[in-house]
A protein has these predicted regions:
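Phosphate/nucleotide-binding beta-alpha loop and adjacent structural elements of enzyme active sites
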Residues: 2-262
Length: 262
């Protein structure tokens, strides 16, 4: 594993990235992070023809996304080739390594018939939905999806997105959604009010009027939790995606023991 990481971070990584992606340019991909075998693995999973419908799109993994759930992306800007095979990225929100990481986790850890995914700073819950849809297509019997989102509006989009993909208790999926933020303690922190299409809002320990981007903001108190409190002590997590806009150091450093145990 260490040798693989060295290879992925080597000076040749950028050149290899262009080769693997057919010289496609990407504003989302910061570093490649994957190898040719990972691209092959991704393609084996992307067996559903990507297409655009009246109110939603379907990607190569079978995930259906309502346009209303991604208000920052215009349907006219979506690239079917990237929706089919998101290398070097999917063209609108995530780079290839994120897809590879989730698929690799599913292949490694769902073999005993269960899979638990956690998405913190989930937005509309794209990785929860993909985990659920892919696991269901593989016949995984016990699927657990745990999502955290501090924005009221985006929390509603996450629930809508999961329901639209039939990922709910009624369809045999254990879903636990927390309207709040992941943090270093259980309690409350501050989160800015922001436009629905602004995916860059970040929580803070104190009330602020200027955010990390220099934007004026008005914050409100929201619940916060440590992951062990929400997930449960001793419960196995197979995939964890954290996107908390710069608070990753605060969150991860306070969860090291729990992360190492998982």
């Amino acid at each position: 594993m260490l040798n693989r990481l060295r290879a992925l971070l080597s000076p040749l990584a950028h050149e290899q990235s262009l080769t693997l992606s057919g010289d496609a340019q990407s504003s989302l991909q910061r570093y490649m992070g994957y190898e040719p075998a990972d691209v092959d693995m991704l393609r084996t999973h992307a067996s559903v023809p990507a297409r655009l419908s009246g109110d939603h799109c379907i990607d190569g993994f079978g995930v259906k996304t309502l346009y209303e759930c991604v208000p920052f992306a215009s349907p006219d800007s979506l690239d079917l080739a990237r929706l089919q095979h998101p290398i070097p990225d999917d063209g609108f929100h995530a780079e290839g390594i994120e897809y590879v990481a989730l698929l690799d986790s599913i292949e490694r850890f769902s073999t005993e018939g269960s899979f638990v995914a956690v998405e913190a700073g989930a937005g509309w819950g794209p990785w929860l939905a993909m985990a659920g849809v892919v696991c269901r297509s593989r016949g995984v019997e016990r699927i657990g999806l745990i999502g955290l989102e501090a924005s009221r509006e985006r929390f509603a989009l996450m629930r809508r997105h999961l329901d639209f993909n039939l990922l709910d208790q009624q369809h045999g999926v254990a879903v636990d959604l927390f309207e709040g933020a992941v943090w270093s303690h259980d309690g409350v922190i501050h989160f800015p009010e922001s436009a629905l299409e602004d995916m860059g809002a970040a929580a803070s320990t104190d009330s602020i009027d200027i955010d990390y981007r220099g934007h004026p903001v008005t914050t409100r108190e929201v619940p916060c939790t440590r992951l062990p409190s929400l997930v449960g002590e001793g419960r196995k997590v197979d995939f964890l995606h954290i996107d908390v806009q710069g608070a990753e150091v605060e969150v991860i450093s306070s969860h090291l023991t729990w992360l190492n145990q998982n």
